[in-house]
Swiss-Prot record:
Example of a GO MF term: scavenger receptor activity
UniProt name for this protein: Sensory neuron membrane protein 1
Organism the protein comes from: Heliothis virescens
Expression sites by tissue: Detected in sensory neurons in the antenna.
Gene name for this UniProt entry: snmp1
Domain of life of the native organism: Eukaryota
Length: 523
C-alpha cells in the first residue's frame, strides 16, 4: 500500500527535522569534541604542538623599577619614598629546545630558552634604559641576608669582604643605569687578594649564585635577568602530551627527573597543573585552571571571575594572587613551619631561587595592609596590578594573559655590620614585571575559521533544518487530513436530505381590538 502524496512529503520533512536534531545536537558536538581532542594534543602533526614549541610572536615583558628618592634618609632608618619608573618594554621570544617524545608514557621532555630585545618605542615616554636609578644594592643585601640567616657568626667577615668587593661603599644603595641592572650587568670585583674578599668570592663561585656570570680576570657580572637572556635553562621539564587523554595535555610530571620537589612541606612539593603554555579543553567555570611556575617553584590556581570576550570570541576570565599562607590550609605548606609564615601576600623565594627575596603582587595588591605603611608612593590597583587570564574554554586557549609579580627585599637591620645598623628592617619593593600575552589578529582569525565559524554555522543551520522540517511535516499532515475530511464530506456513502422550511401561518394583524379596562379591586 502506497502512502498518499501528502504523507510522503510529511515523512520526508519529518526525517529532515529528525536529522537536524540528531546531527545538530548529538553528532556534530561529538565529532567536534573528538576532533578537538586530536588537535589539542601535543602530537607532532598538530598546529598546537608547533606553537607550543615556539611561540610565533613576541610576548610583552615590561619592567617597572622603584627609584628610592630619599636614599640618604633611608640609610638612617627613614621611610622610603618611591617613584615608579617604567615600563621598560622588552619583546620576549620563547621557545622549547632539546624536545624529545616518549611514546611509552605519553610525555615530552624539553628545556626552555627565552630571548629579550629592548623596545624603546614601547617603553615609557623618554625612557632609553640609560637612566640612573637608585635602588637597594640587591647583591650586597643578598649576601648579608643569606649569611645572617644561615651563618650569622660570619657576618663580621662578610662586612670586611664587602668593603673590599664593593670598594668601601658609603651606603647600601646602588646607583646604576636601568639596562645595566636589568640585563647588561654590573661588575663585581673579585680580584682582591685580601682574605675576606677572596674567601667570599670563592664561596660565590661554588654556590652558583643566581644572576652572576664569571668574567675574565676574576670578575663577576651581576644582573637581574641577564643570565636568562638567550640562554638555555638547565632544568629538564617533563609534561604529558595528551594523546592518550587530552585532559592531561601539558601537565607537568617531573623536573630534572624528579617527580616532586623537596623545598617545601607536604603537598606544596607536588607538580600540579600544566607548564603554563597550554591548557586542557572543555574546562567548566566551576573548575580552576592550574599551572606550575618553574621560576617560582609553585602551582598557581586562578579562579573564575566573569565572562569576557576578545576579538569576538567568548572567553572566561580567571584571576589569581600570591595568597595568604598563614590562613589558607592549602598554602600553609609553603611556610617553613605551620606557625612561621610571611605576611599575607608575600612569598619567600629563598628556598626556590636561592636568593633572599619575596614575591608579591605589584604595589602590594591583596597583601597585608601593614606593608603599605612601610613605604610611600605605592597605589595598588587591581586593573593595573592584578594577575588575570582570559581563557577560551572549548579549546583551552589563553587569549589574553597578564602575569604580574613584584620582587621585594628586606632592609636587614643588624649591629654586626656598620652599613646595616640603622636600617629599618622592613620589606621594601625593588621592581615588578608584567609579562603579557595577547593573541594577534592572525591567530584569532585562524581559531575563528577552524572552530567558531563552523560551529556557529551549524548552530544556525540546525535550527533552520529542524524548524523547516517540522513545519513541512505539519503542513503535509494537515493537507492530508483536510483532503480526507473533504472526501468524506462529498462521498456517496453519506446521504444528505434537503430540508424545506415550513411556511408560517399567515395572521391578520391589521385590526387590533380595543383593550378592556381591567377590573377594579376593592381593598
Amino acid at each position: 500500500m502506497q502512502l498518499p502524496k501528502e504523507l510522503k512529503y510529511a515523512a520526508i520533512a519529518g526525517g529532515v527535522a529528525l536529522f537536524g536534531l540528531i546531527f545538530g545536537w548529538v553528532l556534530f558536538p561529538t565529532i567536534l569534541k573528538s576532533q578537538l581532542k586530536k588537535e589539542m594534543a601535543l602530537s607532532k602533526k598538530t598546529d598546537v604542538r608547533k606553537m607550543w614549541e615556539k611561540i610565533p610572536f613576541a610576548l610583552d615583558f615590561k619592567v617597572y623599577i622603584f627609584n628610592f628618592t630619599n636614599a640618604e634618609e633611608v640609610q638612617k632608618g627613614a621611610t622610603p619614598i618611591l617613584k615608579e619608573i617604567g615600563p621598560y618594554h622588552f619583546d620576549e621570544w620563547k621557545e622549547k629546545v632539546e624536545v624529545e617524545d616518549h611514546e611509552e608514557d605519553d610525555t615530552i621532555t624539553y628545556k626552555k630558552r627565552d630571548v629579550f630585545y629592548f623596545n624603546p618605542e614601547m617603553s615609557g615616554p623618554g625612557l632609553t634604559g640609560e637612566e640612573i636609578v637608585v635602588i637597594p644594592h640587591i647583591f650586597m643585601l643578598g649576601m648579608a641576608l643569606t649569611v645572617a640567616r644561615d651563618k650569622p657568626a660570619m657576618l663580621n667577615m662578610v662586612g670586611k669582604a664587602m668593603n673590599g668587593i664593593f670598594d668601601d661603599p658609603p651606603d647600601i644603595f646602588l646607583r646604576v643605569k636601568a639596562l645595566d641592572i636589568l640585563f647588561r650587568g654590573m661588575i663585581i670585583n673579585c680580584a682582591r687578594t685580601e682574605f675576606a674578599p677572596k674567601a667570599t668570592c670563592t664561596a660565590l663561585k661554588k654556590e652558583a649564585v643566581s644572576g652572576l656570570v664569571l668574567e675574565p680576570n676574576n670578575q663577576f657580572r651581576f644582573s637581574i635577568f641577564g643570565t636568562r637572556n638567550n640562554t638555555i635553562d638547565p632544568h629538564v621539564i617533563t609534561v604529558k602530551r595528551g594523546i592518550k587523554n587530552v585532559m592531561d595535555v601539558g601537565q607537568v610530571v617531573a623536573v630534572d627527573g624528579k617527580l616532586e620537589q623537596t623545598i617545601w612541606r607536604d603537598t606544596c612539593n607536588e607538580y600540579q597543573g600544566t607548564d603554563g603554555t597550554v591548557f586542557p579543553p572543555f574546562v567548566p567555570e566551576t573548575e580552576r585552571i592550574q599551572s606550575f611556575s618553574t621560576d617560582l617553584c609553585r602551582t598557581f590556581k586562578p579562579w573564575y571571575q566573569k565572562k569576557t570576550s576578545y576579538r569576538g570570541i567568548k572567553t572566561n576570565r580567571y584571576v589569581a594572587n600570591i595568597g595568604d599562607f598563614a590562613n589558607d590550609p592549602e598554602l600553609n605548606c609553603f611556610c617553613p613551619k605551620p606557625d612561621s609564615c610571611p605576611p599575607k601576600g608575600l612569598m619567600d623565594l629563598a628556598p626556590c631561587m636561592k636568593a633572599p627575596m619575596y614575591a608579591s603582587m605589584p604595589h602590594f595588591l591583596d597583601s597585608d595592609p601593614e606593608l603599605l605603611t612601610k613605604v610611600k608612593g605605592l597605589n595598588p590597583d587591581v586593573t593595573q596590578h592584578g594577575i588575570e587570564i582570559d581563557y577560551e574554554p572549548i579549546t583551552g586557549t589563553p587569549m589574553v594573559a597578564k602575569q604580574r609579580i613584584q620582587f621585594n627585599i628586606q632592609l636587614l637591620k643588624t649591629d654586626k655590620l656598620d652599613l646595616f645598623k640603622d636600617l629599618s628592617g622592613d620589606i621594601v619593593p625593588l621592581f615588578w614585571i608584567d609579562e603579557g600575552l595577547a593573541l594577534n589578529k592572525t591567530f584569532v582569525n585562524m581559531l575563528k575559521h577552524q572552530l567558531f565559524i563552523p560551529k556557529r554555522v551549524v548552530g544556525v543551520l540546525r535550527w533552520w533544518v529542524v524548524s523547516f522540517g517540522s513545519l513541512g511535516a505539519v503542513i503535509g499532515i494537515v493537507f492530508h487530513f483536510r483532503d480526507h475530511i473533504m472526501r468524506l464530506a462529498v462521498s456517496g456513502d453519506t446521504k444528505v436530505s434537503k430540508v424545506t422550511p415550513e411556511e408560517p401561518e399567515q395572521k391578520d394583524i391589521s385590526v387590533i381590538g380595543q383593550a378592556q379596562e381591567p377590573a377594579k379591586v376593592n381593598i
